[in-house]
From Swiss-Prot:
It is a peripheral membrane protein. It is found in: Plastid, Chloroplast inner membrane; Plastid, Chloroplast thylakoid membrane. This is Magnesium-protoporphyrin IX monomethyl ester [oxidative] cyclase, chloroplastic. Pathway: Porphyrin-containing compound metabolism; chlorophyll biosynthesis. Keywords: Chlorophyll biosynthesis, Chloroplast, Iron, Membrane, Metal-binding, NADP, Oxidoreductase, Photosynthesis, Plastid, Plastid inner membrane, Thylakoid, Transit peptide. It comes from Arabidopsis thaliana. Belongs to the AcsF family. GO terms for biological process: chlorophyll biosynthetic process; chloroplast organization; photosynthesis; regulation of tetrapyrrole metabolic process. Its EC number is 1.14.13.81. InterPro entries: AcsF, Ferritin-like_SF, Rr_diiron-bd_dom.
Length: 409
């Protein structure tokens, strides 16, 4: 799960999925500095990496509104949705074909490190080094959250629908592999995420199953477009290839693409999630949440994208447009992101959000900060609402051709 829809505030009444030892699914070793997460309304501070860290030191990362979330759902409803005796719309042949795709495990031997990683990390210094550490932290957290959700779904659906359950388990394998690879990347900076602590300590956002489908489909597809775009750019501009993890993105992104295809098949099996006016409204809502989250996040990290030779806003708009076009094949309605006004609204959101962050950094009293934030929050909310209310693009269909596994480049 390469990208997260994080604008929805997490709620704590839902406990985390019960996994006895999630760390065993993630290859790696102990490192000099272990990073933990803590909840906070303030933006995440830069993370410093140093070889002088004392063994066993715990380093906290602040959790903000846009931090990748961990998700849980109504597993009993999931079991009913995929009960073949209840749901006659399930295309078992399609799921069998998908299962064979996942069993093939095209990337089984892909994520193998070499000495380039440590050498490249040692060359990264100053602000760019800090930015890369944060990139690895956030990416690892997002992938690990996908691992936890998919692993639990695989466990809970085993009796109801063994085929779908096995696919979820194999997707959790992919996510664990990604998270482990990213966490090993942190070892190049003498850091590591405490994934066991994350499992127990993080708050979980509850989504109903249909919302899980919308959010995770978008997360996987936007992750595909982010990875393949960065890979293509660096292949054409090798002088910006400052860390070897990007060389793995071509194959890596196909995991994201296959995961998205699976969620597309899940939604096709539940036409009630796609064929009414409520589905159109929710589709637009989740598209907007994912796009806005990415845009606001990335605009706070322009140094990272500039460091690899990309214009942040141009990169984001390319990813948003391509993701939207892909999503239009399945969602009944999508946003008109190719309307120039949509980008103008995103840019105005960035201005308001940056001012909100700046207020948080001041030494003003809390009530003064609150007063200063009110007009900015109002402005940000009005821009988000205005973007949502823009005339949508009617799209999607539940009349699909038979599934044919393919690679998209």
């Amino acid at each position: 799960m390469a990208a997260e829809m994080a604008l929805v505030k997490p709620i704590s009444k839902f406990s985390s999925p019960k996994l006895s030892n999630p760390s065993k699914f993630l290859s790696g070793r102990r490192f000099s500095t272990v990073i933990r997460m803590s909840a906070s309304s303030s933006p995440p501070p830069p993370t410093t990496a140093t070889s002088k860290s004392k063994k066993g030191t715990k380093k906290e990362i602040q959790e903000s509104l846009l931090t990748p979330r961990f998700y849980t759902t109504d597993f009993e409803e999931m079991e009913q949705l995929f009960n073949t005796e209840i749901n006659k719309n399930l295309n078992e042949a399609e799921f069998e074909a998908l299962l064979q795709e996942f069993k093939t495990d095209y990337n089984q031997t892909h994520f193998v490190r070499n000495k380039e990683f440590k050498e490249a990390a040692d060359k990264l210094q100053g602000p760019l080094r800090q930015i890369f550490v944060e990139f690895l932290e956030r990416s690892c957290t997002a992938e690990f959250s996908g691992f936890l959700l998919y692993k639990e779904l695989g466990r809970r659906l085993k009796k109801t629908n063994p085929v779908v359950a096995e696919i979820f388990s194999l997707m959790s394998r992919d996510e664990a592999r990604h998270a482990g690879f990213l966490n090993k990347g942190l070892s190049d900076f003498n850091l590591a995420l405490d994934l066991g602590f994350l499992t127990k300590a993080r708050k979980y956002t509850f989504f109903k199953p249909k919302f899980i489908f919308y959010a995770t489909y978008l997360s996987e597809k936007i992750g595909y477009w982010r990875y393949i775009t960065i890979y293509r750019h660096l292949k054409e501009n090798p002088e910006f290839q400052c860390y070897p993890i990007f060389k793995y993105f071509e194959n890596w992104c196909q995991d994201e693409n296959r995961h998205g295809d699976f969620f597309s098949a899940l939604m096709k099996a539940q036409p009630q999630f796609l064929n009414d006016w409520q589905a159109k409204l929710w589709s637009r809502f989740f598209c907007l949440s994912v796009y806005v989250t990415m845009y606001l996040n990335d605009c706070q990290r322009t140094n990272f994208y500039e460091g690899i030779g990309l214009n942040t806003k141009e990169f984001d708009m390319h990813v948003i447009i391509e993701t939207n076009r892909t999503t239009a094949r399945i969602f009944p309605a999508v946003l008109d992101v190719e309307n120039p006004e949509f980008k103008r609204k995103l840019d105005r959101m960035v201005v308001s959000y940056e001012k909100l962050l700046a207020i948080g950094e001041t030494d003003d009293a809390s009530f003064i900060k609150t007063l200063k934030r009110i007009p900015l929050v109002t402005s940000l909310a009005s821009e988000i609402l205005a973007a949502y209310l823009m005339p949508p693009v009617e799209s999607g269909s539940v009349d699909f051709a038979e599934f044919e596994p393919n690679l998209v480049y």
